Amino acid sequence: MDITEKVELIERPPTEEVVTHDELVELFKTNSSPKHYIGLEISGFLHLGSLISTGFKINDFVKAGVKCTVFLADWHTLINDKLGGDWEMISKVSKYYQDAFKLVCPKANIILGSDLYQEKTEYWSELVKFTKHVSL
């Protein structure tokens, strides 16, 4: 796929804005497989429309040769008291998001925030509890 085709794929709907077309072209001239990241807070059950529009756009990026990562921010969900701040519920819904994105975007890298900190889960849990009771 040439650069023009890659750029057209990325710019097609539902994309509403690209910082600049020229920067995107230049990016592909200098890097044949740039990285893309999208982060999502687990604020409730995943809406099908959100999964489809986000997932299809991620797939456009992948087809254009972009390495995509979907970061599912389960710790942010806890910090922001979403899903009642119930870690068990957050974990279940996060797994649901993970499975859904793996199904729709099989070539994207799906990462849970808790996967990044699994060796220090107790530390992060205590830190989050502490910081939620402190203000500056």
Positions of predicted regions on the chain:
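Glycine-rich loop at the start of a catalytic domain that most often binds anionic cofactors/ligands
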Residues: 52-55, 82-87
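Core alpha/beta catalytic barrel or barrel-like domain that forms the active/cofactor pocket
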Residues: 37, 69-75, 112-113
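Structured alpha-helical segments in the cores of large, soluble enzyme domains
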Residues: 24, 58-66, 93-98
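Short connector loops at secondary-structure junctions
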Residues: 72-85
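Non-catalytic terminal extensions that flank enzyme cores
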Residues: 1-43
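Histidine-anchored nucleotide/phosphate-binding helix
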Residues: 48-70
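Divalent-metal (Mg2+/Mn2+/Ca2+)-assisted nucleotide/phosphate chemistry catalytic cores
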Residues: 80, 87-136
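Active-site-proximal loop/turn and secondary-structure-junction residues that shape catalytic pockets
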Residues: 42, 74-77, 116
